[in-house]
Design a protein with these regions (language model features):
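Structural recognition of the conserved hydrophobic beta-strand(s) that form the central parallel beta-sheet
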Residues: 36-38, 65-66, 198, 222-227
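Accessory N-terminal region flanking or inserted into the helicase ATPase core
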Residues: 2-5, 102-201, 212, 237-239, ...
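Structural preference for long, well-ordered alpha-helical segments in enzyme cores
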Residues: 5, 16-21, 49-50, 99, ...
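Catalytic acidic motif of RecA-like/P-loop NTPases
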Residues: 42, 203-204
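Short glycine-/polar-rich loops that comprise or flank the Walker A/P-loop
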Residues: 30-33, 58-63, 193-194, 220-223, ...
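Glycine-rich P-loop/Walker A and Walker A-like loops and their local beta1-loop-alpha1 context
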Residues: 1-51
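Conserved P-loop NTPase-based nucleic-acid remodeling module centered on helicase motor cores
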Residues: 31-140, 148
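Conserved RecA-like helicase ATPase core segment
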Residues: 210-305
Length: 306
């Protein structure tokens, strides 16, 4: 079963996830894994919060607080696949510097001498990899481009990308390579078979992450996905410039995955605002991007300082 937990900011989505995990751990300390999947920067705070809430119950062994990168590492550690040392961002930039010194560039030759160029190229290559764009794909695209300037830029990027691949082949893998390996290993990962998974804190996924979620849908017994959006039926969300378009896009794509896999879905909507104790703050949060403007009597909850 796939459950979408939706609500505005401060409506208690993360708390609902933690309370559900806590209840299951108290009722049954052992059993199938309970996984809460978060953006990497949230994992420490949420794991600490969960540990504090369970300190009177002796901690936990079946609950896992993971980011996407840590999930990939766990899958590869348990199911095999880690063959080469991991290359971090600094290491990748050093390799790129070596590639740039030995690669003949055309239109990007001057830019390549600028400070932070390697960091920019590293980010571009990361986006290529997360989107499933290989060197071969770029080479095929080059044959279809008529604009000379664009073609030269893409040709330079392709040469750099190919050079980095050559330097890393059989020696290192980066986070994107690790994620790709994990996606391939997930179907045979018995560790997550029939696990219960909560996915919280994301407002968007890159293409690799969508593929991870699709694999998890096929493996897990239940998945609960939180989205910071208050109404899935509002057609305004379909506009690319809409405030909650990214969250709505996540809902649509993952809902379609569930339909394809014949997985039942449900939607839980949280409406109470737990974050804003002052009525004026809650009103601004609710009405900030709404038109026409709505007026409200001032109750003393805000001060404007100039």
């Amino acid at each position: 079963m796939l459950e979408f937990i939706i609500g505005r900011a401060g409506s208690g989505k993360t708390t609902a996830c933690l309370n559900a995990i806590k209840e299951k751990l108290i009722h049954s300390p052992t059993g199938k894994p309970l996984v809460i999947l978060l953006p990497d920067h949230m994992t420490f705070a949420i794991e600490r919060q969960l540990a504090l809430e369970l300190k009177d119950y002796g901690g936990f062994t079946r609950a896992y607080v993971l980011g996407m990168s840590r999930l990939a590492y766990q899958v590869l550690m348990r199911c095999g696949g880690i063959l080469h040392p991991h290359l971090n961002e600094i290491g990748k930039e050093l390799l790129l510097s070596r590639v740039l010194s030995s690669t003949k560039l055309s239109i990007l030759a001057k830019a390549a001498r600028q400070h932070h160029f390697t960091a920019s190229v590293s980010q571009i290559i990361e986006e290529f990899k997360t989107s499933g764009i290989s060197v071969t794909t770029l080479q095929d695209i080059l044959t279809l481009i008529d604009n000379d300037s664009l073609k030269q830029k893409l040709s330079d990027l392709t040469s750099i990308y190919a050079g980095l691949d050559e330097q890393m082949a059989g020696r290192y893998h980066d986070s994107e390579d690790m994620m790709e390996l994990a996606i391939k290993k997930l179907p045979e990962c018995t560790w997550l078979q029939d696990a219960e998974i909560w996915i919280d804190g994301f407002d968007a996924f890159n293409p690799q992450h969508f593929r991870v979620v699709e694999q998890l849908l096929a493996l897990a017994s239940d998945i609960h996905l939180t989205l910071c959006i208050n109404n899935l039926n509002d057609i305004e969300h379909e506009a690319p410039t809409a405030l909650f378009h990214r969250q709505f896009n996540v809902f649509q794509q993952i809902n379609n995955m569930a339909k394809k896999l014949a997985i039942p879905t449900k939607i839980t909507t949280l409406t109470k605002n737990h974050r804003h104790k002052q009525q004026d703050l809650a009103f601004i949060e609710e009405q900030l991007f709404k038109f026409p403007l709505t007026k409200k009597n001032y109750t003393g909850g805000l001060q404007i300082v100039e």
